[in-house]
Amino acid sequence: FYIDYLEKFVAIKRGINILEIGCGEGGNLLPFAEKECNVTGIDRSEERISQAISYFNLLGFNGRFIHSDFFDFSSEEDMNKYDIILIHDVIEHIDKCRKVEFILHAKEFLSETGIIFWGFPAWQMPFGGHQQICRNGFCSKMPFIHLLPLSVYNKILFIFGENDSCIKELLNIKAAGLSIEHFESIIKESNGRIVDRILWFINPHYKQKFKLKPRKLMPILSSIRYIRNYFSTSCFYITK
């Protein structure tokens, strides 16, 4: 899906440079490697980077994978300028006080004609708190639970047996939660420009997960500030 969408803005062909920040096991970069793009992935998880390297080696594709916190990764260490930077399910995890810093740092790696793709769930959508990572079936399937007051949310997670690391991660996500309005304001604050936006009622990734056909949010809902956050399971942006 990335390829079809991004080709509207950049010709995806052999030799262009692609960077994914928060690349995980490298799955998002594989379609670009298949088209002989130069792909680079960075992730702060050493285990995920090892998995990405093994995955690409197994399939016989070239890819460069770097274990580092992106904030610690200097553009002086990487002389490449990237035609496309992918940032999917990352910005909503960044502390609110560092989001603008993150955006500005990402732009340092962008070529003059390059674009940044952003994908994130609107904070107020039913599972915007990523509570699906909970081990307990009730917590993982309960929509909007992340919107409860902090003390109540913490108590529920504890009562239903979530471990300390899971609770900590979920509370960090709650503290960093990102709405559509907030994202657009920090893009503006970082002197960025929004080239395109798609708000999804049914996330394209749900097609593979749940066999659901992707559906865009109705234009009338997309235009209603704040309310649209409750219905946007994924937000796609192209910025410069």
Task: Annotate each predicted stretch with a short phrase.
Residues 86:
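A conserved beta-strand element that flanks and buttresses the S-adenosyl-L-methionine
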Residues 45-47:
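Conserved SAM/SAH-binding beta-strand->alpha-helix loop
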Residues 100-112:
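A short glycine-rich, Lys/Arg-flanked "PGG" loop and its adjoining helix->strand segment in the class I
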Residues 160-240:
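A C-terminal cap/extension of S-adenosyl-L-methionine-dependent methyltransferases
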Residues 38-43:
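Conserved SAM-binding motif I beta-strand of class I
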Residues 25-36:
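Conserved SAM-binding loop of SAM-dependent methyltransferases across substrates and taxa
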Residues 117-148:
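Conserved class I S-adenosyl-L-methionine
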Residues 52:
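Conserved SAM-binding loop
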